[in-house]
């Protein structure tokens, strides 16, 4: 699994050649895929930022107390089951 020095140098030269020619992607599909990936990552980072902001800024110091609710029967009584 070790990469030889020649392969590493060839890869570095290829990357440097792409940087010099300002052609980072081989086709427009590569560009579109990269834009979609960046959009996805931006959305994930924005959601994480919102979660952190909500946890840090909107938390109350004490535990929340909710009033107990009265349980109401749900549904309709089936009178056919009555004797």
UniProtKB/Swiss-Prot annotation:
Query: What are the record keywords, sorted?
Result: Endosome, Membrane, Transmembrane, Transmembrane helix
Q: Where is the composition biased (Basic and acidic residues)?
A: 63-75
* Keyword hit for Transmembrane helix: yes
Q: Which InterPro entries match?
A: SIM_Modulators, SMIM5/18/22
Please indicate which superkingdom the organism of origin belongs to.
Eukaryota
Give induction info. Answer: Up-regulated in breast cancer.
Q: Give me the ranges of the annotated region Disordered.
A: 60-83
Compartments annotated for it: namely: Membrane; Late endosome
Which residues span the membrane?
32-52
What GO CC terms are in its UniProt record?
late endosome; membrane
State any GO BP term from the record. Answer: regulation of actin cytoskeleton organization
Topology versus the membrane = Single-pass membrane protein
Q: What does this protein do?
A: May modulate lipid droplet formation throught interaction with SQLE.
Self-association state and partner proteins as the record states: Interacts with CANX and DDOST. Interacts with SQLE; this interaction modulates lipid droplet formation.
List the protein's name.
Answer: Small integral membrane protein 22
């Amino acid at each position: 699994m070790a990469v030889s020095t020649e392969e590493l140098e060839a890869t570095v030269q290829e990357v440097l050649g792409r940087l010099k020619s300002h052609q980072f992607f081989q086709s427009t599909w590569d560009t579109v895929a990269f834009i979609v990936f960046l959009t996805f990552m931006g959305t994930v980072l924005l959601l994480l930022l919102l979660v952190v902001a909500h946890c840090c800024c909107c938390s109350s110091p004490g535990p929340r107390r909710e009033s107990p609710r009265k349980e109401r029967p749900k549904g309709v009584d089936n009178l056919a089951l009555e004797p």
